[in-house]
Amino acid sequence: MATSAQLREQITAGRWDGPLAALYGTAPQELARQRARYCAALEQFELYFGPGRQVQVYSAPGRAELGGNHTDHQHGYGLAAAVTLDLVAVAARNTDGYVRVKSRGFNKLDVIDLATAEPQEGESTHSASLIRGIAEGFRTAGKAIGGFDAYTASDVLRGSGLSSSAAFEMGMACIWNGEYACGLDARALAGICQYAENTYFGKPSGQLDQLASAVGGVIFADFADPAAPQVEKIHADGLLPPGMTLCVTDTRGSHSELTGEFAAIRQEMEAVAACLGGKVLGQVPETDFWAALPRLRTVCGDRAVLRAIHYYEENARTLAQRRALLEKRFADFAAMVLESGRASFALCQNVYCATDVRHQGLSVALALSQSILQGSSGAWRMQGGGFAGTIQAYVPETLLQRYHTAMERVFGPGSCYVLRLREQGARQVL
């Protein structure tokens, strides 16, 4: 192990270019940016927690949802990819039983007493609740953990659909796993992080986001048994055809205040399932749903019915998308991306909030994407939880400059990201 000052010297000298290139690519400009970013994070750690401490540096990627919008929490399928936008955490063990985390861009220093395991009043929906919940997840798994101090710097857009929460959670989990030699694998860490998000943070999410960040590459997951999801890793290299680029545009609307909207999707789907004798739609045959449609409209309401239809269609589509990727049939995959996007408008109804129709950033971004990409080999859809945040688009290189310029003209400089898929999951880097 090295001190933060020693690591900064080594990074500047290029000693760690190999591990950095494995995560971010070999382009000289990007490597220079990452060297500067890592050095800045190490400096900030020293500022908040003092110089001379031996530290380790961890990285947890964000994720792009490729298919399976709001299917994972119903015990369906999910398809997602880790991306090169990530959270970097500089960490050092301490001996006082406290966790202290300072995150770039946030004024508050999170301080968590590990002696207090239960969820704390007023802490839900805040990062401190995630840290406390992850600690309890490790203890429940029989692991002996202690305190640490950490500084985090995240390029994963907060509240934007790239799952900044999963990147933060996986960063914290990797620190404990590494600093205290817990030896848990990626899937176990993802389960602990989902537990923290559900039970302590108060967001009823599935596990797809955490798995994508933990495992890396492109993953296909079957959540029929959510306690032990079946995960298939599809290597990211070569999935996109030559000349095709994945872009994500931040419409500058945040998910941060939309927990109630997300929860309503799950609640309505599960209300339909309950009428048919199941807890989730994954336990209810689709034929039973269609047979009971008149009664379901009366009991659950039409929006719940439409969201259930979305689940069945999107789940089948996600399975077909997996096969298209494995067989390198990108044109078929792209056609299903468009179908998924249309379903978000018509069935799941999570492109904008019905209570705030004046603000429809996702709708505008999708319409603009259609105006540029229609008739090309590209595709576009909303991604993530919905209602605000980001859209994704597969953009041919011949249209990339036009697309990028148009999106940033509407949504502001720095809003359109040209992404690379990342093969590696959350891990210690230095």
Segments predicted by a language model, with ranges:
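A short glycine/serine-rich beta->alpha loop
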Residues: R53-Q54, H70-Y77, T116-S124, S154-L162, ...
